[in-house]
């Protein structure tokens, strides 16, 4: 009986400590208003970026978008990057 009671109390104590540690970690990872740019840069490094490509017609009318060509056609370049 005593062993079961000790096991239950130990398990409850571990659960409380784990929950408290998880809440503290979550609070430390939240961004605050007025956060310096250096801290924001660290947050941005962890995020992935998706970049879209825009194409502009240089000389030859309505051709499909191709990679950079040296003579006429379409010229493609990165347009913008979006955080995911």
From Swiss-Prot:
Q: Which family does it belong to?
A: Belongs to the neurotoxin 12 (Hwtx-2) family. 02 (Hwtx-2) subfamily.
- Source domain of life is Eukaryota
Which cysteine residues pair off into disulfide bonds?
A: 51-65, 55-76
Pfam families reported in the protein's UniProt record: Toxin_20
GO MF terms held by the record: toxin activity
Instruction: Give me the residues of the propeptide, which is removed upon maturation.
Output: 23-47
Keywords for this entry?
Disulfide bond, Neurotoxin, Postsynaptic neurotoxin, Secreted, Signal, Toxin
**Could you say which tissues express the protein in this record?**
Expressed by the venom gland.
Give the signal peptide as a residue range, or say none if absent. 1-22
InterPro entries on file: Hwtx-2-like
Cellular compartments annotated: Secreted
Q: According to its record, what are the GO cellular component terms?
A: extracellular region; host cell postsynaptic membrane
Q: What does this protein do?
A: Postsynaptic neurotoxin.
Recorded protein name is: U4-theraphotoxin-Hhn1aa
């Amino acid at each position: 009986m005593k062993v079961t009671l000790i096991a239950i109390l130990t398990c409850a104590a571990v659960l409380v400590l784990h929950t408290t540690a998880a809440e503290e970690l979550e609070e430390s990872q939240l961004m605050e208003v007025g956060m310096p740019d250096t801290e924001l840069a660290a947050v941005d490094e962890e995020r992935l970026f998706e970049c879209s490509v825009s194409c502009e017609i240089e000389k030859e009318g309505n051709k499909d978008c191709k990679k950079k060509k040296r003579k006429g056609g379409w010229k493609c370049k990165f347009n913008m990057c979006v955080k995911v």
